[in-house]
């Protein structure tokens, strides 16, 4: 019998790489026994990035979910692991150091054994801090290398990165091939180097199957000494997900490895339950395109799980772009035309912003920047005229050190806008904030929760936690789901239907129109009405892109109000689109005389947001 290789079921990532939401706690505790009964998993990925936040988004408590979900695996002797984003914790933006420390204490108390900590820039300073905090909390620290392919990201680069992570105290190494574009032979060379130098370090390989390399990569890393392989299972294996455990087991068994048997009766029961969860609500948020493999991803390097959101972004902006082309007497683009242009623009943008590995959140940043550039170019404007604050933070080094050099044109633009590059430790920019959140919880009469887990959720996901506590998150989700179900039902009469949504005992009336893409979301609390229209000459502040309008990015910032004096170029609001806040600048100096939209309102490109006189 050959060397033993173990399997980890990445049940959390199966859902994240396919769609938007995660199963509810009642569903998770139903499927856990069948996953255990399959008898082939040494580990299960239970939570982390894309789990806790998603629970809040549909109005559920993630703390209860994690505790109940990890419990049966502990009882069965199966290790649990989570994904964390190092400096960014469980979100898309940097986290204060005291919140990061509390993060690991809470997750250990909730039953999570291993943290897979990665920095989307592969900045070892961010990862080594996570290693330290995780080990202080009693967790196994699995340091992660985000894999991609560029002139910077060579075999030598990753071997040196592994040396730094081991020296920094890593218990294990994860090879995170999030886009599935790692070349199999090169990955084998990296694993071989690590194992020859650090034979006692556990190596776990995570590869997503979007472009099609993954089975070959699994075989190469296994031959080179990899210990654990991440796998998926039907009906969410393959596509933008992961190789199915059945195939991986048979391939490795044929190669002479010692691999566990699979209880196929339990597999089929788990498969049936997962399909049931999809039919219940999760499937409404899984784009059909995410169920297919496409080697088009090899060239642009974007993770396959982004194809659904990318196609949605392209479709959303296609009409606007074609309007601009029509005004210029140019033929309209098809979605495929726009996708090819988009991939070309990603290839232009990526090296110029320093080759960040294309993983959350930096894959979104590169994709968004490419799309913004494309939209501006089609309107006869210049590149780089729409760069969100989050993207600037990445470019300037506030999230960590970029692997490559930033292009001179962006350095010049930063200087012109008075932006400074940061070369210090990025954590220094984000001081402790737990005391602020404690004050907020005290003021609201909210409990800190077992092991301070409720305090942690507010600190990690402030806006989402507040919406969860108010009931608004649940109401908005229920309304959105009702609209999706109604649209799919394709009722013949096409008459609007009134629904009543019950949220924590409070009833909300929802009107669903079958010819509309979505129903109006019920409001948990009445919002202030926009100001009355003004007469006379005024300059319109126009939405530069479709999305949600917000007066500020967070509750600690002061919103622009009627009567305020602003200067041309001042930030007067934000449009949340494609997972980032895009600043809206005042087009002229003067007094704000009308605010036409409420925070949280959906807006279309070119909608008037406010007026300046």
Located regions from the model:
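Active-site beta->alpha loop and helix N-cap motifs at the rims of alpha/beta catalytic domains
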Residues: 33, 48-161, 180-183
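Terminal or standalone catalytic/regulatory effector modules within metabolic enzymes
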Residues: 36-54, 289-297, 301-527
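Core active-site phosphate/anionic-ligand binding loop and the adjoining beta-turn-alpha structural block
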Residues: 216, 241, 249-252, 256-320, ...
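Conserved, mostly hydrophobic/aromatic
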Residues: 14, 117, 173, 225, ...
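Structured functional modules or segments
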Residues: 533-613
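Hydrophobic faces of well-ordered beta-strands that scaffold small-molecule active sites
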Residues: 6-13, 42-46, 78-85, 115-116, ...
